[in-house]
Amino acid sequence: MAVPKRKMSRSNTRVRRSQWKAARPLLTSCPRCRDPKLPHVACPTCGTYSNRQVINPA
């Protein structure tokens, strides 16, 4: 099993971990109702996807 040769400082550890973060979900606006929605997903407000009615709006 691999073991580190030297102790890694808090500074180096935190610099490395600063890149390990969640990305924000990208939102687009629905072309029909202009509400924010996830891309490539049917709009939960009006129920359209690619200018077609695919689900009944809630």
Swiss-Prot record:
The reply to whether Lyase figures as a keyword in the UniProt entry is: no
Instruction: Name the Gene Ontology molecular function terms of this record.
Output: structural constituent of ribosome
Give the InterPro entries listed for this entry: Ribosomal_bL32 (IPR002677), Ribosomal_bL32_bact (IPR044957), Ribosomal_zn-bd (IPR011332)
The entry's keywords: Ribonucleoprotein, Ribosomal protein
GO cellular component terms attached to this protein's record? large ribosomal subunit
Q: Name one Pfam family in it.
A: Ribosomal_L32p
Q: Name one GO biological process term.
A: translation
Q: Which superkingdom?
A: Bacteria
Family membership, please give it.
Belongs to the bacterial ribosomal protein bL32 family.
**What NCBIfam families has UniProt attached to this entry?**
rpmF_bact
List the protein's name. Answer: Large ribosomal subunit protein bL32
Organism placement in taxonomy: Bacteria, Bacillati, Actinomycetota, Actinomycetes, Streptosporangiales
Q: Which gene encodes it?
A: rpmF
